[in-house]
């Protein structure tokens, strides 16, 4: 099915409709904002989402000037989901533009 609700990368599976994330056999807790940010990236695999697009999707149209929020929450996601958060393989920064999810 093309609209598979579960996205898998590394040893992580993300069930977007159920808001459930599992690494191996361990469930990972994300805050609502972390989950919205991750879902926005997962729904656009391989595509760069600009900071403005992500801020608008996650925080709403009034937050487009608060890119520091985005950096903080991307750091949280990397700490929780990347094997080596300092060298992310899946949640990548496109410097000066935005972020990309690479499966």
What are these regions (language model features)?
Residues 1-8:
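Basic, amphipathic DNA-recognition helix from helix-turn-helix-like DNA-binding domains
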Residues 18-97:
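Positively charged, aromatic-enriched patches within helix-turn-helix-type DNA-binding elements
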Residues 9, 14-16, 101-103:
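Conserved catalytic Walker-motif region of ABC-type ATPase nucleotide-binding domains
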Residues 7, 13, 84-86:
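Generic detector of short alpha-helix boundary/capping microenvironments
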């Amino acid at each position: 099915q093309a609209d598979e609700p579960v996205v898998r990368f590394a040893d992580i599976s993300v069930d977007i409709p159920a808001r459930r994330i599992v690494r191996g056999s361990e469930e990972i807790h994300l805050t609502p904002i972390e989950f919205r940010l991750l879902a926005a990236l997962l729904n656009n695999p391989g595509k760069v989402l600009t900071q403005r697009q992500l801020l608008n999707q996650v925080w709403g149209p009034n937050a487009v000037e608060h890119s520091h929020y985005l950096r903080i929450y991307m750091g949280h996601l990397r700490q929780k989901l990347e094997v080596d958060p300092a060298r992310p393989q899946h949640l990548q920064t496109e410097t000066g533009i935005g972020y990309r999810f690479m499966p």
